[in-house]
């Protein structure tokens, strides 16, 4: 967020949202989260509910109110094919776009039950190829942080 020139209040909101973005997964069975194989349609529906569940968990906590948007919209995509609300482009807050890139990069560069992690170079290449989904300005900010050594493998 700082790399993009966002003001301190918004950076604080992004920090809270980044920490809490997957809090809704508390409502998802561990067997689904850690399933090594393909998810069924029913399991995908449960997984796809976690942003709404997470937003509902924090929406009445006054000090976390500003992060609610980031928690709810971190799976929205620039092309409108994300969830839960199908937002696209500038309808998605900059904070949610930052968390989306960070979350996806983290997922790509971490081991999962269904695949081995990618290295940072592969993760960045993947994000760049998915420009219809992710804000490329945010992706390039991540690249600069990695190149400077602020973020390390």
Short names for language-model regions:
Residues 1-153:
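Metal-dependent catalytic cores of enzymes that make or break cyclic nucleotides
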């Amino acid at each position: 967020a700082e790399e993009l020139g966002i003001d301190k209040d918004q950076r604080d909101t992004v920090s809270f949202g980044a920490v809490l973005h997957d809090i809704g997964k508390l409502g998802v069975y561990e067997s689904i989260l850690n399933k090594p194989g393909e998810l069924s349609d029913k399991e995908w529906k449960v997984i796809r509910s976690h942003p709404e569940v997470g937003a509902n968990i924090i929406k009445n906590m006054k000090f976390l109110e500003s992060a609610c948007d980031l928690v709810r919209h971190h799976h929205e995509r620039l092309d409108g094919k994300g969830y839960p609300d199908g937002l696209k482009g500038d309808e998605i807050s900059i904070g949610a776009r930052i968390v989306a890139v960070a979350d996806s990069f983290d997922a790509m560069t971490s081991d999962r039950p269904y695949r081995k992690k990618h290295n940072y170079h592969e993760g960045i290449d993947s994000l760049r190829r998915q420009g219809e989904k992710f804000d490329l300005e945010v992706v390039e900010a991540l690249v600069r942080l990695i190149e400077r050594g602020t973020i390390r493998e």
